[in-house]
Amino acid sequence: YEIIMCFIYGYLPANTVVRTFNFAAIATILMTLIYELMNVQREIYSFNVAASKKDKYVIARLEGEDEDTRRENELFADSLGGTGEMFCVRQASFINDFFKRVNTRPSYYKTLNYLIPAALAVGLVMFVYGLLSPFSRQGAAASFMGGYAAIMMVLPVAGLFNYSYPFYKASKAAFSTGSTIVGESSLDEYSVGSAISFDDREVFPADRVKIKTIQVVGHMSIDSAIYYASKIFGKTGGPLDDALRSMTQGYEVESRVELLEIAEDGINAVVDGSHVLIGRSEYMTANGIRPINPEEDEEIESGGEVCVMYMAVNDAIAAKLKIQYIIDDDFESILQQLSRAGMCVGIRTFDPNINDRMLSARVRTMRYPVRVIKCRTTENRGKVYEHYSSGILSRSSVRDLLMAQIYCDRILHTIRTNTAVKIFAMAVGAAITALVISLGLIGSLNSLEVALFQFFWLVPMGIVSRLLI
């Protein structure tokens, strides 16, 4: 624009005012630098989490050939009708494909393929309008200046802010809890998720599970009942393993444990040569063992916090345990936010007491899509992968990892909303330029006014970002 004006300036009338709009151009460059700065800082956050020496929790696609993974896939497929990606939580020491994810452009940048040509088209239209409109009656130079001013008014400069600030804000919040989203491409990858599963101990932490009473029968002692239970659940893991481990701390002994069967409502095992059944009253009855006063179980469990579990040793009833499960305070909040993001939640468990009925007594499951997934094999329990490729990770906890997952949907929603704001801003800029050309005031439009118009739209975009993230 300025080169052309240099060549034609000598041929213009003496009173012609030529505007260069350099300040607006410099403001655009400044916005580009701010965009790059926020992106670099966001990538530093991601690298610091990914490079941590701690094992990281990661969001992984639900893949594998083991029995539990197949059952989980089938359960989610039935619930979701076969649509959407299914994810689970795993642990890994090293994160693969970090720089590949950082350098991959997301799909929402394709919007610029339409907005920038649209801005150039507006400039061309305003140039022609300045030449031909009966309202403007301006010369070719003034019309050319009007077209260039229109381009500077409608260029998606605020789009750079839109593509950097929401993600930067979410990354900063995630990093404060030891989590991160790696690269902009991960937003697309993980926002399409329809289901995610994680372990039961995230719902019922160790300090929220307590064995209230142990009623023993015959020659069984309380110590022996605790010993058998701790060895069996030590194999399966979960909240009962944590609770029993704290009760037997300092009394660990080597033992031989073989799990013969893991059913939905009980576990069949051999502990140091003794045949042990542990589970719900239905499991005992199915194995020919009469529970202790089963008629009182319904009344005990109706309160919503205590579950009843039985133990049989060598085909004889041995103990009745009453166990209190208190749900984690933050779980329902996480569940609510995942539900808003359109995700179904699966809770993986070996615990006979944790089922859909038990969970519905503690969480308003009818309001949220949540299912209990009964595991059958222990081969992958507690497995830490040496290498894993994931775009969402946390060095602190599964809860913080899930919050990072929730941010993906929020960021994309914010970007889409702000894109609509930017399109509206472009329309307003085109209308203002057309009005200025019609009034013959294009020579009065200065560079500062154009820059202020562009930066004005950062205010509503910033407000939208703060409200939605």
Model-inferred region functions:
Residues Y1-E65, R70-A195, I392-I469:
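Hydrophobic alpha-helical transmembrane segments
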Residues T248-L359:
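Signature of the cytosolic headpiece of P-type E1-E2 ATPases
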Residues L187-T213:
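Asp-based phosphoryl-transfer active-site loop
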Residues D351-I373:
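Substrate-recognition/cap helix-loop segment adjacent to the acidic, metal-dependent catalytic center
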Residues V18-F21, S171, E202, G273, ...:
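Residue-level signal for inorganic ion chemistry
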Residues A77-L80, G84-N113, Q215-E264, T285-G288, ...:
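ATP-binding catalytic core of ATPases
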Residues K212-I214, H219, Y325-I327:
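A short acidic/small-residue loop/turn micro-motif
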